[in-house]
Amino acid sequence: MASKEIKFGRTAREKMLRGVDILADAVKVTLGPKGRNVIIDKSFGAPRITKDGVSVAKEIELEDKFENMGAQMVREVASKTNDIAGDGTTTATVLAQAIVREGNKAVAAGMNPMDLKRGIDLAVADVVKDLQAKAKKISTSEEVAQVGTISANGDKQVGLDIAEAMQKVGNEGVITVEEAKTAETELEVVEGMQFDRGYLSPYFVTNPEKMIADLEDVFILLHEKKLSNLQSMLPVLEAVVQTGKPLLIVAEDVEGEALATLVVNKLRGGLKIAAVKAPGFGDRRKAMLEDIAILTGGTVISEDLGIKLESVTLDMLGRAKKVSISKENTTIVDGSGAKTDIEGRVAQIKAQIEETTSDYDREKLQERLAKLAGGVAVIRVGGSTEVEVKEKKDRIDDALNATRAAVQEGIVPGGGIALLRSSTKITVKGANDDQEAGINIVRRALQSLVRQIAENAGDEASIVVGKVLDKNEDNFGYNAQTSEYGDMIAMGIVDPLKVVRTALQNAASVASLLITTEAMIAELPKKESAGGGMPGGMGGMGGMDMM
């Protein structure tokens, strides 16, 4: 086992604080409408320019192991906030730094760290309660656009694109952000359920110009196994032919004799048909087939349920107004599943999202939820250069997450004003002087956001805080973009409650841990052993007479 270096008490905390400061100082320059960019060197390709706090935090790794521990703890604040709320990473970092700094001073003055922590926890709970009471629910598309604009650093077009996307696919719908090949940013909306499987044979195409198979008022056969034997499919094919309606087959695969016969029938015009592979793999494939069944009002033909393909009747098939199949994707529009069944399935998937601990599983469940709940919108981000596109994509990702958070829990006045106002509303009392000091640490830390935004805008922080607090109105604040004072909500400067709340709770949680640290252990760097010397040369040839 490698030797370790241990630091105690004040020395440990000072080292840790230095690491916290280095990371937080790099991140906090990005805060606010006049926040600056940070350039990150990449081992390949052009440097990355970003104003996204978590992207900056993730790049920081310090040489000193003890300083690095402090930096990594604050990085954890940014990452956790990003995972839960999708935005507010810079806010969380600034708050964590402010609480750690003030807490460190209090510990150095001889106060009990555990009581300070209890005081901090009491104050944070009180502030969260105050914020929840002040939050305003979002109802209009304009309010959604406002939140998006603020998070995208004042880019109105981004706000409008996000508002339009949410209007079209619903609050639960999937909105993805991709890099475009053009200079313009555009929005594309896919209604209905889309999955990434195309037709199994180009002979199924009905529109040769676009290479798409369009089926109207269609029956859908869902089968979880491979279909290779034609005999077992004949009864259901004959039943569908008699209705004169088209049929879509979704199965693990359709191959051999079965596929050949379907293609021949399609070409002869006897049967309007198309076949695609089922989406996903393993258990996820079963779940997605079940989703399609619920959406279209059909049944998945599965041996688990004891249903044989030979005994399938028309009422076991799903129905949809339209199915559109390209080489890569299949879109089912307006399935005829019962609304109550779809709502039940949506509730079930939401419960699974709450329970899962895997980010990957959560992402896949959210995709399934969106496909059932409304549709998919894609924002394609354009720009003149690759660097510009990446920077813009970062901002749109943040704006999208902030907007979702705002729809969930409502909005509060932005620009750090909600927290500044809450600092004057903390009424909770500590059980002793040290807990009271912990409460005061939070009071002072809540001013740090407005101060930092003002500093980044080139204004005097103390004057800004003073002017805002002089006027006792919840929404009255400071607009750093124009250096004016007024009603923040009326000016469209709002923050999602979920983002502000998550940032504060995570910052206080990690900062409390840092304050209560008394010892730090790190591995000593390995001493490189010096390489062996060169072997000696040949000795002199003494004693030999030269002839």
From Swiss-Prot:
Pfam family for this entry, one: Cpn60_TCP1
Domain of life: Bacteria
Major localization class: cytoplasm
Keyword Isomerase: yes
The keyword Isomerase is assigned to this record: yes
Binding positions (ATP): T30, L31, G32, P33, K51, D87, G88, T89, T90, T91, G415, D495
Keywords for this protein: ATP-binding, Chaperone, Cytoplasm, Isomerase, Nucleotide-binding
One annotated Gene Ontology cellular component of this protein: cytoplasm
PROSITE patterns from the UniProt entry: CHAPERONINS_CPN60
Places the protein is found: Cytoplasm
Catalytic activity: ATP + H2O + a folded polypeptide = ADP + phosphate + an unfolded polypeptide
EC number: 5.6.1.7
GO biological process assignments: protein refolding
CDD domains found in the cross-reference section: GroEL
Gene Ontology terms for molecular function: ATP binding; ATP-dependent protein folding chaperone; isomerase activity; unfolded protein binding
Entry similarity comment: Belongs to the chaperonin (HSP60) family.
HAMAP family: CH60 (MF_00600)
NCBIfam families named among the record's database cross-references: GroEL, PRK00013.1, PRK12849.1, PRK12850.1, PRK12851.1
Functional summary from the UniProt entry: Together with its co-chaperonin GroES, plays an essential role in assisting protein folding. The GroEL-GroES system forms a nano-cage that allows encapsulation of the non-native substrate proteins and provides a physical environment optimized to promote and accelerate protein folding.
Subunit structure: Forms a cylinder of 14 subunits composed of two heptameric rings stacked back-to-back. Interacts with the co-chaperonin GroES.
Protein name: Chaperonin GroEL 1
Gene that produces this protein: groEL1
